[in-house]
A protein has these predicted regions:
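Acidic, turn/loop-rich segments in luminal/extracellular domains of secretory-pathway
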Residues: 1-5, 84-154, 206-219
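Extracellular ectodomain surface segments
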Residues: 8-96, 160-213
């Protein structure tokens, strides 16, 4: 009995990554992103969508001599873009812009995802959204596809305070409160549900009057 080999289809596994809204996720160290979706203190993972090591979360091909490459990439609902042969994420990689950031991937399976903070700024702290990309894996003859899902986690953004001015006649008094007199009206916070409050008031006496303050009032 002579058994003649055929070209078997490659097997692509879905990959995941988790990132903070102001960070960059680089996956390029031959160890796929943690399938549980955990992340380190900087909001980063390292790894590669192509990894033929002992990891259970890898792309593979039953054919011993098959060389796997990424040939196409697209965002969810988008059209495929070709990935240049011999490329890596940081050398001739192909970039695709998703909803919350841009993914750059190479033929070797390495990729980098840079969050677009302007797109994710309205996320409150610990809010989560996802960007999904589909890559095509080839062994030179057959192809298959899998997803890269990036979870973007919101952070608490710094509020923006705007200087306020007022005037008073020489024999009168003016008192301002944060809500009543709109001290906060021109201040802002990009986080959707942020509630702005005045936590401290300090003052300096001028040459023409005196100033007194509490945590809520300025007179």
């Amino acid at each position: 009995i002579t058994v003649t080999g055929i070209n078997d289809d490659p097997v692509a596994q879905n990959d995941v990554g988790v990132i903070l809204e102001d960070s960059t996720l680089t996956v390029a160290n031959s160890a796929n992103a943690n399938v549980s979706g955990s992340y380190d203190a900087t909001g980063e993972h390292s790894g590669d969508v192509i990894d033929t090591s002992s990891s259970s979360h890898t792309d593979s091909d039953p054919d011993d001599s098959a060389t796997l490459t990424v040939t196409q990439i697209k965002k969810d609902g988008g059209s495929n873009s070709a990935v240049s042969s011999g490329s890596s994420y940081n050398s001739s990689g192909t970039s695709v812009t998703g909803t919350y950031g841009t993914l750059t991937i190479g033929a070797d399976g390495s990729y980098s995802y840079a969050a677009d903070q302007s797109a994710a700024d309205d996320l409150d702290k610990d809010d989560q959204v996802t960007d999904v990309f589909t890559y095509t894996l080839s062994d030179g003859t057959e192809t298959t596809t899998a997803n890269i899902t990036i979870t973007v986690i919101g952070i608490n953004d710094t509020p923006t305070a705007v200087n306020d001015t007022d005037s008073v006649t020489e024999d009168e008094r003016v008192t301002k409160t944060a809500v009543q007199d709109d001290v906060l009206n021109d201040d802002s916070d990009v986080d959707d549900s942020a509630v702005l409050t005045v936590s401290n008031i300090s003052h300096t006496n001028g040459n023409s009057g005196t100033v007194s303050s509490s945590t809520t009032h300025l007179t």
